[in-house]
Swiss-Prot record:
Residue span, Globin domain: 3-145
Encoding gene (name): LBII
Superkingdom of the organism of origin: Eukaryota
CC annotations in GO: cytosol; nucleus
InterPro entries xrefs: Globin, Globin-like_sf, Globin/Proto, Leghaemoglobin-like, Leghaemoglobin_Fe_BS
Cited PANTHER family: LEGHEMOGLOBIN-RELATED, NON-SYMBIOTIC HEMOGLOBIN 2
Family indicated by similarity: Belongs to the plant globin family.
Function, as annotated: Leghemoglobin that reversibly binds oxygen O(2) through a pentacoordinated heme iron. In root nodules, facilitates the diffusion of oxygen to the bacteroids while preventing the bacterial nitrogenase from being inactivated by buffering dioxygen, nitric oxide and carbon monoxide, and promoting the formation of reactive oxygen species (ROS, e.g. H(2)O(2)). This role is essential for symbiotic nitrogen fixation (SNF).
Intracellular or extracellular location(s): Cytoplasm, Cytosol; Nucleus
Post-translational modification: Nitrated in effective nodules and particularly in hypoxic conditions; this mechanism may play a protective role in the symbiosis by buffering toxic peroxynitrite NO(2)(-). Nitration level decrease during nodule senescence.
Protein name: Leghemoglobin-2
Alphabetical UniProt keywords: Cytoplasm, Heme, Iron, Metal-binding, Nitration, Nitrogen fixation, Nodulation, Nucleus, Oxygen transport, Phosphoprotein, Transport
Residue positions binding O2: H62
Lineage of producing organism: Eukaryota, Viridiplantae, Streptophyta, Embryophyta, Tracheophyta
Length: 145
């Protein structure tokens, strides 16, 4: 079990709301960061076949879903100290053979994107809360393989 406070959940929720304020812009930041760090990741996302396009609803929809899952992870951590991922989510990641290094790249892109979204409201405490929520989500997805 992981201790996750109301304050940490609030920080993650606030970062998610900042992301939602301009989903197309921050989706581009997110996927551009992923592709800069791991160009082969382009093959994992069918909607990246023609590059990072802010007008692509699949790109923005997937980013919104992922960032929402991190927010939901924070809520689960605060409520129960653990995260449970949907079995279908585990199956998709297993089918795509997503490995630990790829989860790390996504976490780095998530943090960079949220840091840009919240601007001067970024803090070490917010970064720690986001990383913990993401790490527990990633662990739950791997467990659901």
């Amino acid at each position: 079990m992981v201790a996750f406070s109301d304050k940490q959940e609030g920080l993650v929720n606030g970062a998610y709301e900042a992301f939602k304020a301009d989903i197309p812009k921050y989706s581009v930041v997110f996927y551009t960061t992923i592709l800069e760090k791991a160009p082969a990741a382009k093959n994992l996302f069918s909607f990246l076949a023609n590059g990072v396009d802010a007008t692509n609803p699949k790109l923005t929809g997937h980013a919104e879903k992922l960032f929402g899952l991190v927010r939901d992870s924070a809520a689960q951590l605060r409520a129960s100290g653990g995260v449970v991922a949907d079995a279908a989510l585990g199956a998709v990641h297993s089918q795509k053979a997503v490995n630990d290094a790829q989860f790390v790249v996504v976490k780095e892109a998530l943090v960079k994107t949220l840091k840009e979204a919240v601007g001067d409201k970024w803090s070490d405490e917010l970064g720690t809360a986001v990383e913990l929520a993401y790490d527990e989500l990633a662990a739950a997805i791997k467990k659901a393989y």
